[in-house]
Amino acid sequence: MSGTLSFDFPSYAVVGQKVESYVSGITTPSGSDLEYFWVSSDMDISDNDTVIGQSISFTLPADPGEYSITVYARSISGEYYSSSSTASVQVISTDADGVTGRYTDVRDGEIYHYRTYGSLDWFTQNLRYSGADADTLLGRPYDDSEGIDQIFGRLYSWSDATGGVSGSGLGGGPQGACPEGWSVPTVEDWEDLALAVGGSALDFLDHWAGIGEMVSAPITLNGSAMWPYSPDNLHTNTRDWNGFPTGNSRDHYGEYENIAVYGMWWASTENADGMVPYRFIFYNTDTFDVYYTDKESYGVSVRCVRLSSQGQ
C-alpha cells in the first residue's frame, strides 16, 4: 500500500463532546478495496471493541484526561501489509467562574458570564462566536480543535474581532464579533479596568505590575495547573476576571503557539501607525503588559464589554 493514513481528530476537547472523523490517504497498487478498523484502549467508541468503516462517530469520556484512538487499514484481498495511524486528545473540564450576571447571545444561544468592573460590564469568559455561517467564519479554536472553544474561546485576528473598525472612548468600541449591545474594548475601557482592579489610574502603555496576577485564574488541565508555576505570578484571580493561558495563532490562523504560557486579549484602538494592541499575561511575571502588532497575522482572545448602565 502507498500513502499515509490521515484523519481529523481534535488535540483538545471538552468532556462529553461528540467527535466525528473520516480516514483517507491510502491506496493499493492494484486498486483493490480497503477496509478500516478503529480501536481505542481507553475510550468506549462503540458497543464492540472495534469500529469497522472509513468513518467514526462517538462521544468522548465524561472524565478529563488524555485519550487515544488508532485506525488500521488493510486490503481486503490480503495481498498487502496493513497501515495504521494513532491520534491523542486532551479532554478538559473546568469550573472557573466569576459572575455578576449571565448574558445569552441570541445569534447562537451561547451563554456568557459577566462581571461589573468600574463603569463597564466585562465578559469573564473569552468570546467563542464563530460567525453566522461557513461563509462568514470568524476566528478559530486553538489548534483548530472544535469544542475546546467552550472553555478557551476562539482566537481572532484583529480584523475578525473588530470588523476592521477602530474604537475610542469609554464604551466606544466596535461591536465586531461581539453580541449586539457589546463591543471590543478600547484603550479607555482597558484603563477603566485597571483602575477598578488595581485601585489607581494606569496609562494603557504601562506594564500594569501586579494586575496580571489578580486577573489570571489558576485553571487546572486534567488535574495539573495549566499556568506553569512561578513565584512571580501565583495567578490568584482575586478579581474574578478568569484570565486563561489560551495562547495565540500566527500567519492568519496558520500556526498555533503559547498555550499554557500566555493569555492575550485585543484592544480595538488602532494607533497612528496602523498597528493594533493586545494586552498579555505571561506565566512568569505579574504584569498585564501591552504589545502592538498588525491587524491580520496574530490571533488572540476577545473579551466583550458594555457600559454597565446598559444592562440595567
Q: Where are the predicted features?
A:
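Short, solvent-exposed loop/turn segments at the edges of extracellular beta-sandwich modules
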Residues: 74-80
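Surface-exposed, flexible coil segments in extracellular/virion-facing regions
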Residues: 39-58
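Solvent-exposed loop segments of extracellular immunoglobulin-like
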Residues: 27-37
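A short beta-strand segment in extracellular, disulfide-stabilized domains
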Residues: 16-27
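Conserved positions within compact, well-structured domain cores
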Residues: 94-312
